[in-house]
């Protein structure tokens, strides 16, 4: 890697935003009913569905109801009812399940919600005493799909003889079944799971796919027109709120970018909002959602400044100013960074202004996270400018931080409600295994994408490149190893609800960060940098309503 000294780097090749002023000027297509009418109808339907939870007396009905409500994306209305139902399901265990599908579904729902179920309880439904797979389960694609999804909640203590080989077994037979005669909607559900297993799928992404599938299941026992209507109305009403916020944040970004004039950065405000929305999509999380989206954008600005424009000396001065966090240090910076630095500080001040008096301390953690990120960006810049390829261990220790999981885990807490305790902030800012694992998912998937597509930023050598050089192996071996580290990281994330039960609501939000990375880097793409590849997905979330 060539040393670039103190000269500015070449201009980037980032494509311009695919959105422009789209959301600033956007006028939603009128629906058949007004927002007020939808909100009133939702309140009525919510009461009806609450009654369904109360009316469920057997475990099978409770399990199916929880599954449907979650996959339709309306579980945020029924948190207490779901917790009560799952506690009852947990007491019943898996042993009395009548099928592989039923056992695997219970296993997944319980583990996702922080109820521990030993893997052995599920393995009984798929293996004989001698360890061989039970004859006949290969002819049960619905059961195999449920097994495949459930087994992806594997943790570190469960080894390769239980859930991991169940994943391999189920995948092999699902791929074969998919090539044959699977019917809709099972065929589509298998296809989605083979791309991203359900426990790693974003709630809103699954809801968009599952709502029309649920509509087609009117002959099924789990079908309810009341639940379906609630899901459609809730999605559309929330989408209107998200469209209003996109208008606001797009204008914020237009004003900010116009003032600071950093033409070399990735113009991705809609993508930053999407990232935040994947963590906080609910109506009651509007403050948290908008703060996190802005933190995303500010970290992206910082990343691109270090990676594609600043000389080494400029990078050092910028980091020094960020560590001191004093506007008077602006005089130390080159002209093009002065406005940027002042705007960073003023935006963090605005974050604090949005907090109640007893919440003001949160911004101290927010700033500290940004400072830590800057320090690690500088280390990468030092490596790059000195032509250094670090050891794999050193590279990972720095790049997992620059992947942003820590600063974003702090940022997602800033605007939250009572769940965002001091304990939660200490957990997020510390070297916590779950936060680190989320960072590994982000970093390794990003690096595998960059290796496949070719880097278009002046980054230091990636984890893939460092592994190849250090171990003198072909790229296929390095990529396989990095991919195995992603799977190890998911085991750590899966363990977090049981290791940190008091922080479960926060753990869920952090897990959503890892899920969003999985979608952004699906099939080794980079849907943030190359956001043209992601436009259709964003349209399904923010432009197209669901027909009523």
Curated annotation (Swiss-Prot):
This protein's pathway reads: Secondary metabolite biosynthesis; terpenoid biosynthesis
EC numbers on record? 4.2.3.173
Q: How does activity depend on pH?
A: Optimum pH is 8.
Among the record's GO biological process terms, what is one? terpenoid biosynthetic process
Q: What induces it?
A: Induced by fungus spore (F.graminearum) inoculation and methyl jasmonate (MeJA) treatment in leaves. Triggered by abscisic acid (ABA) in roots.
CDD domains, per this entry?
Terpene_cyclase_plant_C1 (cd00684)
Binding of Mg(2+) 2: at which residues?
Answer: 303, 307
Q: Which GO terms describe its cellular component?
A: cytoplasm
- Catalytic activity of the protein: (2E,6E)-farnesyl diphosphate + H2O = tau-cadinol + diphosphate
Name of this chain's protein: Tau-cadinol synthase
Keywords (A to Z) from UniProt: Cytoplasm, Lyase, Magnesium, Manganese, Metal-binding
Pfam families (UniProt xref): Terpene_synth (PF01397), Terpene_synth_C (PF03936)
Organism, by scientific name, is Zea mays
* Ranges in coiled-coil conformation: none
* Oligomer and partners: Monomer.
Which prosthetic group or cofactor does it need? Mg(2+); Mn(2+)
Q: Where is this motif: DDXXD motif?
A: 303-307
User: What residues bind substrate, as annotated?
Assistant: 303, 307, 443
Which positions are annotated as binding Mg(2+) 1?
303, 307
Q: Which gene encodes it?
A: TPS7
């Amino acid at each position: 890697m060539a040393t670039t000294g103190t000269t500015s780097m070449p201009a980037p090749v980032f494509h311009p935003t695919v959105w422009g002023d789209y959301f600033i000027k956007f006028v939603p297509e009128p629906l058949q009913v007004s927002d007020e009418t939808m909100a009133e109808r939702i309140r009525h339907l919510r009461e009806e569905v609450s009654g369904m939870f109360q009316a469920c007396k057997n475990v099978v009905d409770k399990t199916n109801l929880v599954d449907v409500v979650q996959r339709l994306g309306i579980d945020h209305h029924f948190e207490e009812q779901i917790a009560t139902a799952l506690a009852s399901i947990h007491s019943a265990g898996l042993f009395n399940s009548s099928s592989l599908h039923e056992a695997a579904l219970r296993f997944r729902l319980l583990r996702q919600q922080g109820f521990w179920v030993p893997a052995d309880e599920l393995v009984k439904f798929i293996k004989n005493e001698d360890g061989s797979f039970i004859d006949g389960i290969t002819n049960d694609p619905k059961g195999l799909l449920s097994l495949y999804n459930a087994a992806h909640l594997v943790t570190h203590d469960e080894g390769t003889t239980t859930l991991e080989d169940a994943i391999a077994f189920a995948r092999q037979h699902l791929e074969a079944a998919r090539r044959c005669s699977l019917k809709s909607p099972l065929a589509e559900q298998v296809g989605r799971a083979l791309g991203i297993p359900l426990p790693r799928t974003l709630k809103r992404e699954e809801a968009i796919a599952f709502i029309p599938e649920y509509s087609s299941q009117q002959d099924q026992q789990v079908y309810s027109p009341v639940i379906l209507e609630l899901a459609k109305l809730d999605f559309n009403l929330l989408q209107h709120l998200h469209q209003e916020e996109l208008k606001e944040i797009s204008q914020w970004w237009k004003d900010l970018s116009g003032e600071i004039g950093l033409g070399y950065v990735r113009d991705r405000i809609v993508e930053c909002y999407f990232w935040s929305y994947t963590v906080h999509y609910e109506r009651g999380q509007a403050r948290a959602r908008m703060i996190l989206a802005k933190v995303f954008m500010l970290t992206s600005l910082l990343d691109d400044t270090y990676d594609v424009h600043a000389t080494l000396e400029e990078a050092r001065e910028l980091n020094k100013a960020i560590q001191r966090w004093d506007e008077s240090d602006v005089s130390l910076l080159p002209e093009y960074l002065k406005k940027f630095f002042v705007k960073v500080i003023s935006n963090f001040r605005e974050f604090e202004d949005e907090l109640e008096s007893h919440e003001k301390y949160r911004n101290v953690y927010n700033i500290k996270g940004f400072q830590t990120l800057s320090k690690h960006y500088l280390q990468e810049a030092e490596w790059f400018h000195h032509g250094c390829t670090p050891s794999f261990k050193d590279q990972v220790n720095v790049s997992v931080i620059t992947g942003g999981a820590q600063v974003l885990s702090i940022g997602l807490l800033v605007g939250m409600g009572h769940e965002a305790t001091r304990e939660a902030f200490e957990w997020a800012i510390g070297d916590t295994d779950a936060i680190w694992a989320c960072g590994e998912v982000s970093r390794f998937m990003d690096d595998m994408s960059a290796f496949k597509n070719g880097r278009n930023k002046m980054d230091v050598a990636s984890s893939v490149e460092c592994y190849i050089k250090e171990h003198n192996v072909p790229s296929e071996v390095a990529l396989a190893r990095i991919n195995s580290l992603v799977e190890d990281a998911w085991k750590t994330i899966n363990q977090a609800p049981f290791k940190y039960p008091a922080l479960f609501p926060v753990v869920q939000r952090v897990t959503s960060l890892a899920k969003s990375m999985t979608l952004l880097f699906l099939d080794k793409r980079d849907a943030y940098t190359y956001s043209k590849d992601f436009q259709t997905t964003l349209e399904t979330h923010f432009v197209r309503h669901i027909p009523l």
